A protein has these predicted regions:
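Conserved small/polar residues in nucleotide/adenosyl-binding loops
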Residues: 216-218
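Active-site phosphate-binding strand-loop segment of PLP-dependent enzymes
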Residues: 153-213
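Conserved beta-loop-alpha segment that forms the PLP phosphate-binding cup at the N-terminus of a helix
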Residues: 88-114, 122-128, 132-133
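Glycine-rich, histidine-containing beta strand-loop boundary motifs that form or position
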Residues: 92, 117-120, 176-177, 212
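Glycine-rich phosphate-binding segment of PLP-dependent enzymes
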Residues: 23-85
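Gly-rich Lys/Arg/Thr-decorated short loops/hinges at beta-loop-alpha junctions or inter-strand turns
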Residues: 54-60, 139-147, 174-179
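Generic structural signal for well-ordered, non-membrane alpha-helical segments
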Residues: 5, 9-16, 20, 38, ...
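Flexible glycine-/small-residue-enriched beta->alpha junction loops
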Residues: 124-147, 165
Length: 218
């Protein structure tokens, strides 16, 4: 039984099969682009592992408090090299994105500081972390205030409103890249880069935190 006969026996007509093949042909350039990105990212990771001289000893188990866990420390150096950052925190104890965001916020904000969300209201899961919903050990309870700048009606950043909202107490701005449950498009890396450059021009010492869903950049 050849392929066409097999599909026919499954109730798939020639018309449907030809349509599927036409769609695949149309998508070939997209698939090729994805494969190219994957290849480049793989090379980036391999380069980061070579730079940090990953070897068999880094995969050995450790005991005790983990102060000398060279495998863990080197893994974080590999992440930092791959993502071109000063440092990285990679731990199995960080169970989800909200957990990672809570760590980043708690580590960078002190009592009297202000967190400014400049892409509208963050995900619902952050409400208790910030203190928008009453919760023990929230940033609000810790003495950190919260302010928010909504996006424009077209889903773009409101630069004049952001500039007005920045003040002496503003320590950190929060940018949510994903559209979440909204209908706007997700922000591109270029758009976020322009936004951060603008915020830095207004307040050079501001900390810019980007919620990239599966990756947190500070």
């Amino acid at each position: 039984m050849n392929r066409d006969e097999m599909y026919l026996s499954l109730g798939v007509s020639d018309k449907v099969l030809q349509f599927g093949e036409a769609v695949l042909d149309e998508l070939k350039p997209r698939f090729a682009g994805i494969e190219e990105i994957a290849e480049l990212n793989q090379a980036k990771v391999i380069g980061a592992m070579q730079k940090n001289r990953v070897n068999a000893t880094h995969f050995a188990a450790s005991t005790g408090y983990g102060y000398d866990d060279e495998g863990r420390d080197n893994l974080e150096r590999v992440y930092a090299s791959a993502f071109h950052t000063e440092a990285a925190l990679v731990r199995p104890q960080i169970t989800c994105g909200t957990h990672a965001l809570a760590i980043a916020l708690s580590a960078n904000l002190l009592p009297g500081d202000e967190m400014l969300a400049i892409s509208g209201k963050p995900y619902d899961t952050l409400e208790e972390v910030i203190g928008l919903r009453e919760s023990p050990c929230s940033l609000k309870e810790y003495g950190v205030s919260y302010a928010q700048v909504d996006l424009r009606e077209d889903g773009s950043f409101d630069f004049p409103a952001i500039e007005r909202a920045l003040n002496d107490k503003t320590k950190l701005i929060h940018i949510q890249r994903s559209k979440g449950y909204a209908t706007r498009p997700s922000f591109s890396v270029e758009e976020i880069g322009q936004l951060i450059a603008f915020c830095k021009s207004c307040k050079p010492d501001i900390i810019c935190m980007v919620d990239n869903l599966s990756l947190i950049h500070i």
